[in-house]
Amino acid sequence: MDITQIDIPIRFTDYQELNTKDQLSGGHTIGTTILNKEEAKRGIVEMLIQKNLPRIILCTIVIHELVHVWIFHHHLELPAMEEEGLCKFMEYLWLEKQATPLANVHMKLKHQNQCPVYGDGFRNTHSLYIELGSNIETLIARLKSKRSPK
């Protein structure tokens, strides 16, 4: 999942500005990535993250938003449920590596999330990962195979 050659401006902001910028979510947002999708100027405008978050939340948000950047950079045209599911799943893998009681709580919350896009998306991605032998490269290859032709 190489995105090391991309400049990604990250800006910490307050809740009000962040939620004003993210008009589409219709809910509480604590991180978002603003993209320029015009082919002539395609790129990452900036990543906005709410200020003063606890470490575990900050890390999962940065992971989540970096996965959106990776998906954008690789021109994947995934349905929202698959894209958000992959983002949530990558957060989950990081939480798993933390091996703390707090990380375990956040992992459990991902399984219990009732939102169709985020919760079902996560559970579908997690199930596919297990079905594919718990191999992240195979999971990514499967998602890449869905790339829209240009």
Identify the role of each PLM range.
Residues M47-L48, E65-H68, Q112:
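Helical anchoring/docking segments at protein termini
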